[in-house]
Structures are given as C-alpha cells and as structure tokens.
Amino acid sequence: MTTPAIISVAITGSVPRKKDCPGLPVTVSEQIESTHAAYEAGAALVHIHVRKPDESPSSDPDLFAQVQEGIRKHCPDMIVQFSTGGRGRSQSERGAMLKHARYGIPRNRIGELSQHDL
C-alpha cells in the first residue's frame, strides 16, 4: 500500500543570511528559482519569507506578490504559504500580504499575537 505524502519546503526562513549560507535564496528571483527546483524535485508546498535588500525579513505585500507571480508561472500546481511571522512588526503589517494569498494557505502563528492583536 502506498501512502500519499505532501512534500513541503521552506526555502529561506526568517533568520539565515547569505553570510551563513552563500546559496540561500533571498531575492525574489532566487526564491522563484529555488522554489522551481524544489517543485521539479517533487515538492507540493512552499513556505515563503521575503527579504529586504539588506536581507532582513520583510512583510512587504509587493515582494510577496512578485514571488507569488513567479511561482504561479513556473510551478502552477504548487501550494504557496506566506509567512505571517514578523518580530517587531504589528499584526496588520505581518498580514498585509494576505490579499495576494489567493492560491495558497496563509500561516498565522497564534503564539506571536498579543492580546491587543485579537
């Protein structure tokens, strides 16, 4: 008997930088390319963190939209999960990209919400 499985990848994470791992995909084009390679290898779900030019974490909805567009073009069946994490950012900032999450599953870390966010 074969048990179906979903392979998911988190290609970047929120903490590592290129100084930690030179091959880390941090730009939009690098993230699309890395996601496409994972898709071709069998991954069905990708968890996305976007970065600012200085490689620090970002909640920029436009960056998420660019990554989403590239993934849709090259990996049409892939499930995309945007990270809503964001140390030091408000819940509304961290969730601003959700308007672009039409074809995926957003992730919201309840442990990061404060009483004032609920």
Task: Report each predicted region and the residues it spans.
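N-terminal small/glycine-rich loop or linker at the start of catalytic domains
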Residues: 1-23
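Active-site beta-loop-alpha junctions enriched in small/polar residues
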Residues: 10-14, 51-53, 83-87, 111-116
